[in-house]
């Protein structure tokens, strides 16, 4: 039986508009820097934190089912650490064999080395999970509160969004239609919003959009976002749960030229249903920009696997975690009435990439 050939996404060209012609993916969504060293440091930190907290997590009394899922997942990873060739941490077996004191000293050395640098949030994040895990699973503190302290979560998202340069993508789109109606899903701390808005300016500072709707499932982030983006006009802040029909939540069907989603669509129970809800919002010639986690490593699983939403995809073929590779996004987009993936750009070469930046548009007559 013949197997379907996986497309070489990096050489796909994207036609924005007749006046622009083809936009090569590597020009519109390119890595900002060589990140191999960063990714290896991050992987080493989370693996050491995972090993260090294994015993106390096993002894803790989990108060929620998703905490039990996390504990089972981490126990399985711990067994993999003992085998040679763990991704990005080839000496994981030696890290397991270290004494607790030596491992703790190595963890603190990494933390000290990145203080006051852009790497601080991605090294401090795993430490906070390790340091607070018993209080989290026994219900005395919430993970989100732990990660929000000192602006860590916002700085973490800024680091992740800074791995790839997508501002030219939004700028080219804005130049082809300076009256864009844009909706961002799950905008959260505004890391992607900031880069989109920076790109949606002409050379003389004119805004290249008519409206920008900043949405999130909760209004928790809205006050901070209003302060962060007070210098921009025509931004509206609204609550939206994209796992539900958006029209029933007061949004207009077929109204948006561009929908932006950064690491949010995976956190829903059924991706095809969610993508159908996204398609409902788009104009027939509109675009979805979907930035999604696609890392070979398990850093993100370690960081946010204690959140209930991380395990929502059990019945959707995502029992081991919510993230899927671009080939699978392509298939599910087609099932939801899109043409599939129009283009994909990664923020680094394998196996050191973190995000996949994906563009899709509605299928005609779907």
UniProtKB/Swiss-Prot annotation:
S-adenosyl-L-methionine binds at residues 189, 216, 245-246. Gene3D superfamilies: Vaccinia Virus protein VP39. Pfam families: Methyltransf_12. SUPFAM superfamilies: S-adenosyl-L-methionine-dependent methyltransferases (SSF53335). GO terms for molecular function: methyltransferase activity. One of its GO terms (biological process) is biosynthetic process. Calbistrin A has been reported to possess a number of interesting bioactivities including antifungal active against Candida albicans and cytotoxic toward both healthy and leukemic human cells. This is Methyltransferase calH.
């Amino acid at each position: 039986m013949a197997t379907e050939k996986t497309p070489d996404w990096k050489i796909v060209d994207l036609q924005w508009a007749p006046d622009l012609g083809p936009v090569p993916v590597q020009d519109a969504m390119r890595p900002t820097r060589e990140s191999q060293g960063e990714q290896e440091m991050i992987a080493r930190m989370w693996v050491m934190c995972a090993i260090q907290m294994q015993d106390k997590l096993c002894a803790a009394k989990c108060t929620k089912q998703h905490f039990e899922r996390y504990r089972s997942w981490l126990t399985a990873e711990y067994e993999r650490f003992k085998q040679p060739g763990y991704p990005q941490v080839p000496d994981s077996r030696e890290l397991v064999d270290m004494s607790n004191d030596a491992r703790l000293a190595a963890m603190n050395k990494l933390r000290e080395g990145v203080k006051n640098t852009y790497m601080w949030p991605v090294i401090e994040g795993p430490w906070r999970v390790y340091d607070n895990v018993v209080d989290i699973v026994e219900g005395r503190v919430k993970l989100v509160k732990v990660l929000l302290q000192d602006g860590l979560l916002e700085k973490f998202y800024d680091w992740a969004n800074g791995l790839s340069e997508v501002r030219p993508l939004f700028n080219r789109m804005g130049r082809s239609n300076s009256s864009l109606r844009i909706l961002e899903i799950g905008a959260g701390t505004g890391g992607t919003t900031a880069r989109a808005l920076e790109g949606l300016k002409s050379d003389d500072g004119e805004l290249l959009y008519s409206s920008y709707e900043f949405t999130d499932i909760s209004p928790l982030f809205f006050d901070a976002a209003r302060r962060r983006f007070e210098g921009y006009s025509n931004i509206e802040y609204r609550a939206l749960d994209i796992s539900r029909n958006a029209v029933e939540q007061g949004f207009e069907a077929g109204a948006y030229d561009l929908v932006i989603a950064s690491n949010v669509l995976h956190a829903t129970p059924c991706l095809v249903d969610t993508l159908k809800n996204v398609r409902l919002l788009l104009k027939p010639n509109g675009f979805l920009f979907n930035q999604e986690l696609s890392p070979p490593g398990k850093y993100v699983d370690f960081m946010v696997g204690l959140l209930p939403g991380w395990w929502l995809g059990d019945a959707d073929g995502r029992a081991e975690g919510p993230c899927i590779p671009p080939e699978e996004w392509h298939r599910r987009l087609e099932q939801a009435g899109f043409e599939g993936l129009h283009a994909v750009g990664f923020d680094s070469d394998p196996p050191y990439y973190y995000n996949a930046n994906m563009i899709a548009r509605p299928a005609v007559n779907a």
